[in-house]
Swiss-Prot record:
Binding site for [4Fe-4S] cluster 2: 190, 246, 395, 399
Any one GO cellular component localisation term in the record: cytosolic [4Fe-4S] assembly targeting complex
Protein name: Cytosolic iron-sulfur assembly component 3
Residues making up the signal peptide according to the UniProt record: none
Xref: PANTHER family: NITRATE, FORMATE, IRON DEHYDROGENASE (PTHR11615)
Gene3D superfamilies per UniProt: 3.40.50.1780, Fe-only Hydrogenase (Larger Subunit), Chain L, domain 3 (3.40.950.10)
Gene Ontology molecular functions: 4 iron, 4 sulfur cluster binding; metal ion binding
Family per record: Belongs to the NARF family.
Amino acid sequence: MASPFSGALQLTDLDDFIGPSQSCIKPVTVAKKPGSGIAKIHIEDDGSYFQVNPDGRSQKLEKAKVSLNDCLACSGCVTSAETILITQQSHEELRKVLDANKVAAPGQQRLVVVSVSPQSRASLAARFQLDSTDTARKLTSFFKKIGVHFVFDTAFARNFSLLESQKEFVQRFREQANSREALPMLASACPGWICYAEKTHGNFILPYISTARSPQQVMGSLIKDFFAQQQLLTPDKIYHVTVMPCYDKKLEASRPDFFNQEYQTRDVDCVLTTGEVFRLLEEEGVSLSELEPVPLDGLTRSVSAEEPTSHRGGGSGGYLEHVFRHAAQELFGIHVADVTYQPMRNKDFQEVTLEREGQVLLRFAVAYGFRNIQNLVQKLKRGRCPYHYVEVMACPSGCLNGGGQLKAPDTEGRELLQQVERLYSMVRTEAPEDAPGVQELYQHWLQGEDSERASHLLHTQYHAVEKINSGLSIRW
């Protein structure tokens, strides 16, 4: 089975696909009852299993269930989890929710919200030969025609992710004398990188990774907490869909850390890749260029919905550039007008330095693609990593080249990427500190920038995945 996931998680060409119901090495814990003795297993005609005790009493046995979370927390394979994700998070699932809304009784409908990433918007703009602003408005028009209630831009959520990353770096820099694991701080927005770190390097690498949530998951907090309150709804009454450049975002949305136990709902219910949205357009017989534009929705009255916005610093969110500028000013009182990148081994590994009187004060880097990530990890393990901060992304060339982006039917890949980069950069940029509505939400929704509530809703944690050495994992 060919996997549609990005190359970030496919470290070899080996296809380890197993159907979730066929074989699995996940051990199941069974509580042993004292003095239970020997029992027999009886199989009924319908395939159900009964335990027959020595005293003649029988008890139906529960089937062992392997959930998506079990798959994600297991180092046995990757593709089983991918298979489940493809069925649980697809444009067909969105269709089901929209169709259910059409026949639901008043008050039983779910509010459907779609949050679109700037990278996906740029990819669609290149395909339909539109600019990014027109694409955003026409995409809003399309979603609302098929039954979606609100369409937002995830760039607004990225303001919070960038601001939290900035603050966290400054705090770590000031604490580096007391902690060997404070620096380098590694960016946390890429789920392919996070999955690799948790499963391959575990407790060694995780302390270095920023705890700031990615824009997708900040958007999840905004929609299922702030926006739900504004709409006088509980989180489970909202169906939240994100449109992302990468299949690995489906893995991120499925993490238990982003699941609301009280209301039994995820912060992001469904992740669609750019390609899946294009497929949805095709199935509906709609060309984006022919639709009438409709303004995006704003999360608050102070947030303008007239046009989409973005940030400086490249197509992966600009984490290095924003953290670098903030740290230079906050730690050394130096205003940085332009950030100059110095290519190192290749175009996907570049350095940025802050110097004063010949002394290097800050040394940052971008590391895109697993070859560069592996080199970075090896430097860390040898204690020879010279960097204070690294913007890490699993995909070569970063998020604009994500595995879920549209491929060119008649254009060379590099040429298409350049076109997508150009369209992405044409959108008006703003500093996260100055973005309308951000400080308002920090005060009224999060109860302050350094509050426990802000920490809970804007940060996350990571979990080392213990490798299971089991004979059951050997395929003879």
